[in-house]
């Protein structure tokens, strides 16, 4: 169980670094926000998942 908790914590730390490169690339494209907002929102969705997962796993580790 500890490995799962450590993996979830790592994911919750590592995944937010992806938009650091992705979001400026979307805004630098010729179409800008109008064509790239789906990319930004789909990139933000996986960032939400590890947060409750870490909470659930943390409550089960004593």
Swiss-Prot record:
This is Photosystem II reaction center protein Z. One of its GO terms (biological process) is photosystem II stabilization. It is found in: Plastid, Chloroplast thylakoid membrane. It comes from Selaginella uncinata. May control the interaction of photosystem II (PSII) cores with the light-harvesting antenna, regulates electron flow through the 2 photosystem reaction centers. PSII is a light-driven water plastoquinone oxidoreductase, using light energy to abstract electrons from H(2)O, generating a proton gradient subsequently used for ATP formation. Belongs to the PsbZ family. PSII is composed of 1 copy each of membrane proteins PsbA, PsbB, PsbC, PsbD, PsbE, PsbF, PsbH, PsbI, PsbJ, PsbK, PsbL, PsbM, PsbT, PsbY, PsbZ, Psb30/Ycf12, at least 3 peripheral proteins of the oxygen-evolving complex and a large number of cofactors. It forms dimeric complexes. It is a multi-pass membrane protein. Its main location: plastid. The chain crosses the membrane at residues 8-28, 41-61. SUPFAM superfamilies: PsbZ-like (SSF161055). The keyword Ion transport does not apply.
């Amino acid at each position: 169980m500890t490995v799962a908790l450590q993996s979830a914590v790592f994911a919750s730390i590592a995944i937010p670094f992806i938009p650091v490169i992705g979001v400026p690339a979307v805004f630098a494209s010729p179409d800008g926000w109008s064509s790239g907002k789906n990319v930004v929102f789909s990139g933000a969705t996986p960032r939400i998942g590890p947060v409750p997962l870490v909470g659930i796993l943390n409550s089960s580790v004593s």
